[in-house]
Regions:
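Active-site anion-handling motifs in enzyme catalytic cores
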Residues: 1-227
Length: 227
């Protein structure tokens, strides 16, 4: 029997209740939400030298892509050579630079060099936003994403960015809608607003801490009563 059930999204909360959980679940934000990326042990000068050695041009705007070949091809189709395309996941022939040898800390830090990130992944979404960089989140093509709200979609809804989430089969018919939003995000210079929204979501960690604190206090009280 569990004394605490922490969940990261509403779909999981509904599932937990559907299988007869005897206690209510508590929304527990992913630790990435309150990660201080500026405090990571990253030598920024050394990282920038590494990026230059891979072909990254710091005089040209860049778009990070954390997914496979299809997404890189879509972004290339939208922007041509206007932006550098930086691959962060699987190497792609459509990327100008593929970064597949970064340390976990460097990888968490590198998003700040982009004007925008395209990704299908939850932690890619969070790390980009934690760096103050806007995101276009693309749903993974799966039976789950067709029938349920994904973790990425749930999170973007919580922080008021649900209009940055798209479903696509990567055909050209979706390009105009996605690009219109991407262009808007790039032009907004919304770094400070993004960081404020992330900090607001991070406040939810207090719920988790308070619940755990109460459990510990209750356990200690029971142990003292039994002594």
């Amino acid at each position: 029997r569990y004394n605490f059930l922490g969940v990261r999204d509403d779909e999981t909360a509904r599932f937990v209740q559907s299988i007869g959980a005897s206690i209510s679940s508590v929304h527990t934000c992913d630790p990435t939400v309150f990660l201080d990326v500026n405090a990571l042990p990253v030598n920024s000068m050394a990282l920038e030298e590494k990026l230059r050695a891979r072909g990254f041009d710091f005089t040209k705007p860049a778009i990070g892509v954390m997914s496979g070949n299809q997404m890189c091809r879509m972004v290339r189709r939208m922007y041509g050579k206007r932006y550098q395309i930086i691959g962060l996941q699987s190497p792609s022939v459509y990327a100008d630079v593929n970064l597949d040898d970064l340390s976990p800390y460097e990888w968490s830090y590198v998003f700040r060099y982009f004007s925008l990130t395209f990704t299908t992944f939850f932690h890619g979404t969070l790390l980009s936003l934690r760096n103050g960089v806007p995101v276009i989140a693309i749903a993974l093509e799966s039976e789950y994403s067709h029938n349920h709200m994904t973790k990425v979609q749930d999170f973007l809804l919580r922080v008021g960015m649900e209009d940055c989430y798209f479903k696509t089969d990567y055909s050209r018919r979706y390009d105009a809608e996605i690009k219109a939003k991407a262009d808007q995000l790039i032009s907004m210079n919304a770094r400070e607003r993004i960081l404020r929204q992330m900090d607001c979501e991070a406040v939810n960690v207090e719920k988790f801490i308070n619940c755990i604190r109460r459990l510990i206090v209750n356990k200690e009280d029971k142990e003292n009563q039994n002594d």
